[in-house]
């Protein structure tokens, strides 16, 4: 009978066990490879404050559905500032020594630290947490966290968590430590977002500040220059070069007008005369403020147009306000002021002392001999002549006189006081009678002749009157004594060397200067003075001449009226006697008179001075043909004596100050 196979059955069972175990291992390895895996390449990252950063995160999964990515923030368990400064606690140091894998700053319960969701992404949608809304934070690529600007509170642990619906195996999270640091040892940038390469930042900032300051200063100056009524500057401004310097006078006047008191700096010129314009300066401030209407302006302001108005400052003031009327008037008057017109009118209206002696300027340039025959105008006629006053006050010459204007006496007096007066007008003058002709050129010529004898007085060759004397009217001496008492010796002893004037019939006598005038009782007495200095008085021929003259009168009547007299014979004596004494005074003669009448007349004439008023008037009444012949012979002798004298120099004539009439 056959046997059972036991050993072959055991061998087949062992082979099957090994195959099952192999397939089990393969399946297990496949499951491990296809599970979810999350990794972070950088476990610790350091970033700068206010700088952007990116936290990297990678994951792998076998699921075909999109994964959900989430970033969480967990703060440190302990402050890292103490570790950096070496101020960690002893307990934390002991725990770290016993467990090397434990970190006291990172490993702790979530209840002991701050946990916040930073951002999450599902598909293409990114959602920020409540604490990070408004910041530049997003999730880029698959799971990278990008932060635009880091803040001081961003330091801590950041966890990357990946969730898939059908892949639940594997490691789905990982963490990275972020440490935010600030710059130390360097100054912070003044302009963080602006880089200046050509200069330091502080220099650039300083230049910007200085430029802004200068800009405001320039704006202030331009505003000041364009508005001179509000302030006063003296710097030229490019905005308004025409208003470079505002006038100080207008500025002070404006301040004074606003304050209500007169200005300290007067901008109104003094009164000046303009032809055909009434005299007077600017009206006072009180008169302007009392009137409701604006002040009057110059006539050229309305008729001259824009060309006649001089360029100047215009004050932006209200014309209706009383406080600004004075300032407005002063400003307008200064703009219209013309110095050339003022000087022209001033010299046209002023009549000088010499030019007023003639009617027009052409006569003043005539020769000396032509002017001698021209008589001065009547002083009384000028006072009442309207043509004269119309020419003077109207500024017209004598040749172009218009119709005479009627000026009263008060207007004439005010005109005289307003005109400038020369020094010669200030001196004392003689009061002449009204209606009598003034001194003509003949008297001035005789006065000039007597004035020119100063140089010959010291040599003893002059027999003219003393220098510095002047002519006086015979009317002014009418109240004096006529020397009716006393003998001829006493009279001719006191009166010496007196030459009669060339025009004796005009009623003028020759008197010494006021500085050398004698007392009133002796002033009319002419004296015969020796011309030789340092010598005793010579023999007086006066008495002998008078005796010979008396004897010659009957002889002249018997001869038929001879004109030769002892006085003329005395004048024809030699130059020696003429150098000591002047010729004797002339007397009047009557041709064909009897001896009795001559003796009576001689007795009366001897009792009177030869230069008295009565003697001259008596001579004029009794003047006949014989007297005219004697006068002509006397003038011929005078002309001969003048020809013998040396010619005078032009400088011998008196100056203008000495010709005070």
Swiss-Prot record:
SMART domains cross-referenced by the UniProt entry: IG (SM00409)
Chain intervals with Acidic residues compositional bias: 595-607
Domain called Ig-like V-type: residue spans: 36-177
Tissue: Expressed in epithelial tissues, mainly in liver, kidney and colon.
Record Pfam families: LSR (PF05624)
Role this protein plays: May be involved in ER stress pathways with effects on lipid homeostasis and insulin secretion. With ILDR1 and LSR, involved in the maintain of the epithelial barrier function through the recruitment of MARVELD2/tricellulin to tricellular tight junctions. Also functions as a B7-like protein family member expressed on immune cells and inflamed tissue and with T-cell inhibitory activity. In the inner ear, may regulate alternative pre-mRNA splicing via binding to TRA2A, TRA2B and SRSF1.
Name of protein: Immunoglobulin-like domain-containing receptor 2
């Amino acid at each position: 009978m056959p046997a059972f196979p036991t050993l072959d059955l055991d061998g087949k069972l062992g082979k099957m066990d090994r195959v099952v175990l192999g397939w089990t291992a393969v399946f297990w390895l496949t499951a491990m490879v296809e599970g979810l895996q999350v990794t972070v390449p950088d476990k610790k990252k350091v970033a700068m404050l206010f700088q952007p950063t990116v936290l990297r995160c990678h994951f792998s999964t076998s699921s075909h559905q999109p994964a959900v990515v989430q970033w969480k923030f967990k703060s440190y368990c302990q402050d890292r500032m103490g570790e950096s400064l070496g101020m960690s606690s002893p307990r934390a140091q002991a725990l770290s020594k016993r467990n090397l894998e434990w970190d006291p700053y990172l490993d702790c319960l979530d209840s002991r630290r701050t946990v916040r969701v930073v951002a999450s992404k599902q598909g293409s949608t990114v959602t920020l947490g409540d604490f990070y809304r408004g910041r530049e934070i997003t999730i880029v690529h698959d799971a990278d966290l990008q932060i635009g600007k880091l803040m001081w509170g961003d330091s801590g642990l950041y966890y990357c968590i990946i969730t898939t619906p059908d892949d639940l195996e594997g490691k789905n999270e990982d963490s990275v430590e972020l440490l935010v640091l600030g710059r130390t040892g360097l100054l912070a940038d003044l302009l963080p977002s602006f880089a200046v390469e050509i200069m330091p930042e502080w220099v650039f900032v300083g230049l910007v500040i200085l430029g802004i300051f200068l800009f405001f200063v320039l704006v202030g100056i331009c505003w000041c220059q364009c508005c001179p009524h509000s302030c006063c500057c003296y710097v030229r401004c490019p905005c308004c070069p025409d208003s470079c310097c505002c006038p100080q006078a207008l500025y002070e006047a404006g301040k004074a007008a606003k304050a209500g008191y007169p200005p300290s700096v007067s901008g109104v010129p003094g009164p000046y005369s303009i032809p055909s314009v009434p005299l007077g300066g600017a009206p006072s401030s009180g008169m302007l403020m009392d009137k409701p209407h604006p002040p009057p302006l110059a006539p050229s302001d309305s008729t001259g147009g824009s060309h006649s108005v001089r360029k100047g400052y215009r004050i932006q003031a209200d014309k209706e306000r009383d406080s600004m009327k004075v300032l407005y008037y002063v400003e307008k008057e200064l703009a219209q002021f013309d110095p050339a017109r003022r000087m022209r009118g001033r010299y046209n209206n002023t009549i000088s002392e010499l030019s007023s002696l003639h009617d027009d300027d052409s006569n003043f340039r005539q020769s000396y001999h032509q002017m001698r025959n021209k008589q001065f105008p009547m002083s009384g006629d000028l006072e009442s002549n309207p043509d004269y006053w119309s020419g003077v006050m109207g500024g017209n010459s004598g040749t172009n006189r218009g119709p005479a204007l009627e000026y009263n006496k008060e207007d004439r007096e005010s005109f005289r006081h307003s005109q400038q007066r020369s020094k010669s007008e200030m001196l004392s003058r003689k009061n002449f009678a009204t209606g009598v002709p003034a001194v003509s050129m003949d008297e001035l010529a005789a006065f000039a002749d007597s004035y020119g004898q100063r140089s010959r007085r010291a040599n003893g060759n002059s027999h003219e009157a003393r220098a510095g004397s002047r002519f006086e009217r015979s009317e002014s001496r009418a109240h004096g004594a006529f020397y009716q008492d006393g003998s001829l010796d006493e009279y001719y002893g006191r009166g010496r060397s007196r030459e009669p004037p060339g025009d004796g019939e005009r009623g003028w006598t020759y008197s010494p200067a006021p500085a050398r005038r004698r007392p009133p009782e002796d002033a009319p007495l002419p004296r015969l003075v020796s011309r030789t200095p340092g010598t005793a008085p010579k023999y007086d021929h006066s008495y002998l001449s008078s005796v010979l003259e008396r004897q010659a009168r009957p002889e002249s009547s018997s001869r038929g009226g001879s004109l030769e007299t002892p006085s003329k014979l005395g004048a024809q004596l030699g130059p020696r006697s003429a150098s000591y004494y002047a010729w004797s005074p002339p007397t009047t003669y009557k041709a064909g008179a009897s001896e009795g009448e001559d003796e009576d007349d001689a007795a009366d004439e001897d009792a009177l001075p030869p230069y008295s008023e009565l003697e001259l008037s008596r001579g004029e009444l009794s003047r006949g043909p014989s007297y005219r012949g004697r006068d002509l012979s006397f003038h011929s002798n005078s002309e001969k004596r003048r020809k013998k004298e040396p010619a005078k120099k032009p400088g011998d004539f008196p100056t203008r100050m000495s010709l005070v009439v």
